């Protein structure tokens, strides 16, 4: 794992989760923010999210509990939460899907989109569609 992504757990207190531990970890939490960076060798923005994610957690002053996907779990989470692009932030309430933000955004976009996601009712995530992966930057 790249040192900047590892620092999410080691320095910033993000709890690492796998496909086997996410449900148990997220269920008791009010709102969890699952950070899924992607492979820095293949995803140019992955390290940007590793820098921005701790700042988002600080900005929301305890409203979200930070989690980080292990590299081995990222593709599983992609299928489970239906996103096509990395990096991504997935928001869960008591382990249930609220929404996701793909790619890197302007700070003002995060500050507008995250509160809107946090107000949503839990729902099923979108189904993963491979064809959505080309050029789609919309939030789910």
Can you say where each PLM-predicted feature lies in the sequence?
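Conserved strand-to-helix beginnings and helix N-cap segments that scaffold or border functional pockets
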Residues: 46-50, 111
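Charged, surface-exposed interaction regions in soluble eukaryotic proteins
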Residues: 64-80, 84-87, 102-105
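Alpha-helix N-cap/helix-start motif
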Residues: 45-46, 100
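Thiol-based oxidoreductase modules, predominantly thioredoxin-like and allied folds used
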Residues: 16, 36-38, 49, 54-75
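Short histidine/acidic/glycine/proline-rich micro-motifs that form metal-
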Residues: 39-43
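Structural micro-motif
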Residues: 30-32, 81-93
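N-terminal leader/targeting and pre-domain segments
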Residues: 1-31, 120-140
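Non-catalytic, surface beta->alpha helical segment in thiol-disulfide oxidoreductase systems
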Residues: 90-131
């Amino acid at each position: 794992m790249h040192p900047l992504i590892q620092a999410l757990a080691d320095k910033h207190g993000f709890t690492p989760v796998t496909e086997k531990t996410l449900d148990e970890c997220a269920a008791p939490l009010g709102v969890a923010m699952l950070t899924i960076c992607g492979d820095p060798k293949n995803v140019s923005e992955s390290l940007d999210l590793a820098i921005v994610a701790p700042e988002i957690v600080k900005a929301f002053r305890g409203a979200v509990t930070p989690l980080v996907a292990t590299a081995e779990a990222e593709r599983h989470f992609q299928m489970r939460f239906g996103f096509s692009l990395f990096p991504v932030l997935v928001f869960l309430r008591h382990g249930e899907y609220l929404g996701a933000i793909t790619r890197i955004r302007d700070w003002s976009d995060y500050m507008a989109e995250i509160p809107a996601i946090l107000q949503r009712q839990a729902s099923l995530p979108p189904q993963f569609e491979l064809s959505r992966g080309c050029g789609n930057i919309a939030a789910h």
